Regions:
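Helix-loop element at the rim of GNAT/NAT acetyltransferase active sites that forms part
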Residues: 3, 10-27, 63-66
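Active-site rim helix/loop that mediates acceptor-substrate recognition in acyltransferases
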Residues: 23-46, 51, 60, 82
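Conserved beta-strand in the GNAT
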Residues: 54-63, 103, 116-121
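Conserved acyl-donor/pantetheine-binding loop and adjacent beta-alpha core of acyl/acetyltransferases
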Residues: 65-114, 177
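Conserved GNAT acetyl-CoA-binding A-motif
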Residues: 114-115, 143-156
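Conserved beta-strand-loop-alpha-helix junction that forms the acyl-donor binding cleft
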Residues: 118-127, 152-162, 177
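Conserved acetyl-CoA-binding loop-helix of GNAT-fold acetyltransferases
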Residues: 122, 128-141, 166
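Conserved active-site alpha-helix within GNAT-family acetyltransferase domains
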Residues: 133, 145, 157-174
Length: 177
């Protein structure tokens, strides 16, 4: 992926979510890059939404046990680990704790899902224009082509649940962490 795309994607993440920055004491956009690299290390397909040649949103999905893109997935995973263990992050354990909070799937659902919506983000200045809907529809189409039937969506209380309801998603479980 081109560096300018990575930079814009990290900028979107940084502007929208904390991603463990406050607790980890990480400098600048370090947590945004860590999160982006972790997303890319598991993502099967990634879709970008642009307006006037500027990335205004992106979405991706992961597929459990996929053997595709192994080299690039490992590269991005390594980049995330390097950043976590760098001097840019004061409290490394805080990053690991933050990540573990969102990787919680109940054991009775382990075999229900084929994969996960790894990311869906739209710049707050471009919301309400149908970009989120277009991105999610594209991800659903690509996942279907990839023979997937059930994608899990893990999110937090900042999520717009009405959006997912309108898209036909079904809430299976709600947990507070």
């Amino acid at each position: 992926m081109l560096i300018f795309k990575l930079k814009r994607m990290a900028e979107l993440l940084y502007n929208e979510w904390d991603l463990g920055k406050r607790l980890s004491g990480a400098k600048g956009k370090t947590c945004a890059y860590i999160y982006l690299f972790e997303i890319l290390s598991e993502t099967e397909k990634l879709v970008l939404k642009k307006e006037n040649n500027k990335i205004v949103g992106f979405a991706g999905y992961s597929k459990w046990n996929s053997k595709k893109r192994i080299i690039s997935k490992r590269f991005y995973g390594l980049m995330a680990k390097i950043l976590i263990n760098s001097p840019l992050v004061k409290n490394k354990q805080a990053i690991y704790d933050y990540n573990n909070e969102y990787d919680n799937i109940p054991s009775d659902l382990n075999n229900y899902f084929d994969g996960e919506l790894s990311i869906l983000i739209v710049d707050k200045n471009y919301r309400g224009k149908g970009y989120g809907k277009a991105l999610l529809n594209k991800i659903f189409s690509l996942a279907k082509i990839d023979n997937m039937k059930n994608l899990q969506i893990l999110t937090d209380e900042s999520c717009n649940f009405k959006f997912y309801d309108a898209m036909g998603c079904k809430k299976i479980r709600e947990v507070s962490v």
